[in-house]
Amino acid sequence: MIQPQTRLKVADNTGAKEIMCIRVLGGSKRKFGNIGDVIVASVKSATPGGVVKKGEVVKAVIVRTKRGVRRADGSYIKFDENAAVVIKDDKQPRGTRIFGPIARELREKDKEFNKILSLAPEVL
């Protein structure tokens, strides 16, 4: 569950290291986001020479959460960290590489995230 003020690690090579959620997109009363949801975030720390700079407001898709997600067979998949991938307005990733595993639920949420899934080293 990602809500405003939650800090997430960035799982791509855009240059951002950590972002902070400003808003979960998808309705005015939306309080929490889970895997596959798009958020608006502020870059809190970044590497020099990256695509994004510190203080920049970006859109990102959540790819890993500590809370995890329940699957249809009753099992849960949880991760060690909250992580997101910085995306453009057309839902394509801004970076060229993705780090760490990505949950399969991302494919079921939106077909436009297939590029992120194809770049990921592992899909769980």
Curated annotation (Swiss-Prot):
Pfam families, sorted: Ribosomal_L14
GO molecular function, one term: structural constituent of ribosome
GO CC annotation: cytosolic large ribosomal subunit
Keywords recorded for this protein, A-Z: Ribonucleoprotein, Ribosomal protein, RNA-binding, rRNA-binding
Entry keyword annotation includes Transferase: no
InterPro entries listed in its UniProt record: Ribosomal_uL14 (IPR000218), Ribosomal_uL14_bac-type (IPR005745), Ribosomal_uL14_CS (IPR019972), Ribosomal_uL14_sf (IPR036853)
NCBIfam families (alphabetical): rplN_bact
Protein's job: Binds to 23S rRNA. Forms part of two intersubunit bridges in the 70S ribosome.
Subunit structure: Part of the 50S ribosomal subunit. Forms a cluster with proteins L3 and L19. In the 70S ribosome, L14 and L19 interact and together make contacts with the 16S rRNA in bridges B5 and B8.
Family: Belongs to the universal ribosomal protein uL14 family.
Protein name, entry field: Large ribosomal subunit protein uL14
Organism: Clostridium novyi (strain NT)
